[in-house]
Amino acid sequence: MATAPYNYSYIFKYIIIGDMGVGKSCLLHQFTEKKFMADCPHTIGVEFGTRIIEVSGQKIKLQIWDTAGQERFRAVTRSYYRGAAGALMVYDITRRSTYNHLSSWLTDARNLTNPNTVIILIGNKADLEAQRDVTYEEAKQFAEENGLLFLEASAKTGENVEDAFLEAAKKIYQNIQDGSLDLNAAESGVQHKPSAPQGGRLTSEPQPQREGCGC
């Protein structure tokens, strides 16, 4: 039997959501490139990144869709929620308005993804402690009340960026193992052992507009 030309067993689709300027694209760039881009133009539409990680001995390719935070792009970016296995919902710990808008982002995520989508709340810019406008405790309480994973991170220093993507992947993989995530479901957001480079559900999305590393 021919061996599939892949060095991973699963593909997980992620989306990154949240207000404009919270650092979504900077988190993605830090995770995929191990670099911080200080001056990122805002994302126009959707951007895309990938990286292979390991969870419980399994190689997993993350396909990550970074969505624009501006209201005028919401209709476009909502189409990318479909079939997401994981969602990273980001706010800026120094801007309370971005935290106050989380309920709206969460409503979209709940309504447009499958019931088993793993959502992790990320308080970005943890390196700016002196400018903090949202406490760790209140964000943690919001996460607990809504059944979300939670951590604070810094796209600038790299603090907890790796953990944000990995913790979501661990939970998704756990859901696969315990049977709560049906890999045969069209909206699972997971592919197991793909057999062709462009085959399957996860690469059927429209091509994103790539306009630099927007925050």
Curated annotation (Swiss-Prot):
Residues the entry annotates as binding GTP: 21-26, 38-40, 42-43, 69, 124-125, 127, 155-156
Catalytic function, reaction form: GTP + H2O = GDP + phosphate + H(+)
Lipidation positions, renumbered (S-geranylgeranyl cysteine): 213, 215
A GO MF label: G protein activity
Subunit note: Interacts with ZFYVE20. Interacts with KIF16B. Interacts (GTP-bound form) with RUFY1; the interaction recruits RUFY1 onto endosomal membranes. Interacts (GTP-bound form) with RAB11FIP1 (via its C-terminus); the interactions doesn't mediate RAB11FIP1 rectruitment to membranes. Interacts with RAB11FIP2.
NCBIfam families: small_GTP
Name of protein: Ras-related protein Rab-14
Species classification: Eukaryota, Metazoa, Chordata, Craniata, Vertebrata
Gene symbol of the encoding locus: RAB14
